[in-house]
Amino acid sequence: MEKEAYILEVVKYLKGRGFQDIKANVEGYETPVGYSLKTDEQKYIPDVTARQFAENSYFEVVLKTEPVSRTISKLRLLSTLAAAKSGKLFLMAPRGHFNFAKDMIAQHQIHAEVIKIA
């Protein structure tokens, strides 16, 4: 399944749990604000952002088929942003990618919660 299809699953998951102001990096939704690091020319756009109970949270679909170094940089940035904005970072891991996501955040000390998605 393509990453865009997983992002739509995440949006559906969030709507079912009462999240509001959902922005997603897929067609048909408002695109979340992109961020960049001072040391990097790359612009990182979260897959999904949403708000619940005045907390802004970031949701990132993690696939082991994506470049690891870019994924780690993006997750570190989003983790820092979430902490600064009193929010959380959630890694949405499809079947077969869950252990990869758990190992990655443990190895690179990224503060995030990993959630399984279908």
Indicate where each model-derived feature is located:
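Active-site metal-binding core of divalent-cation-utilizing nuclease and nuclease-like domains
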Residues: M1-E4, G16, D21-E55
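Conserved catalytic cores of phosphodiester-cleaving nucleases, focusing on short active-site segments
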Residues: P46-K74, L78
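Arginine/glycine-rich "motif VI" loop of SF2 helicases in the C-terminal RecA-like domain
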Residues: S79-S86
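Domain-level recognition of nuclease-like catalytic cores that cleave nucleotide substrates
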Residues: M92-A118
